[in-house]
Swiss-Prot record:
This is Omega-hexatoxin-Hv1a. Spear and Spear T (Vesparon) are biological insecticides containing 20% of the active ingredient GS-omega/kappa-Hxtx-Hv1a. They are effective against thrips, whiteflies, and spider mites in greenhouse settings. They have a large molecular weight, are hydrophilic, and have many hydrogen donors. They kill some insects on contact. The peptides block two ion channels in the insect nervous system (a voltage-gated calcium channel (Cav) and a calcium-activated potassium channel (KCa)). Could be considered as a biological insecticide candidate, when fused to Galanthus nivalis agglutinin (GNA), a protein with the potential to cross the insect gut. This chimeric Hv1a/GNA variant shows a gain in toxicity on insects when administered orally (tested on Mamestra brassicae), while maintaining similar effects as the wild-type toxin when injected. Transport of fusion protein from gut contents to the hemolymph of insect larvae, and binding to the nerve cord indicate that the fusion with GNA permits to deliver the toxin to sites of action within the insect central nervous system. GO terms for biological process: defense response. It comes from Hadronyche versuta. It is found in: Secreted. Changing residue 27 to A: 14-fold decrease in toxicity to crickets and 30-fold to flies. Abolishes toxicity to crickets and flies. 195-fold decrease in binding affinity to cockroach membranes.
């Protein structure tokens, strides 16, 4: 089974994250990317 994505790492879907939560965050460049909470 695939391992879960840790907090702060880019993610496609909530289910991919260890926290089961993937939300849009703004990075240092001002771009918005989905990362695990």
């Amino acid at each position: 089974s695939p391992t879960c994505i840790p907090s702060g790492q880019p993610c496609p879907y909530n289910e991919n994250c260890c926290s089961q939560s993937c939300t849009f965050k703004e990075n240092e460049n001002g771009n918005t990317v989905k990362r695990c909470d």
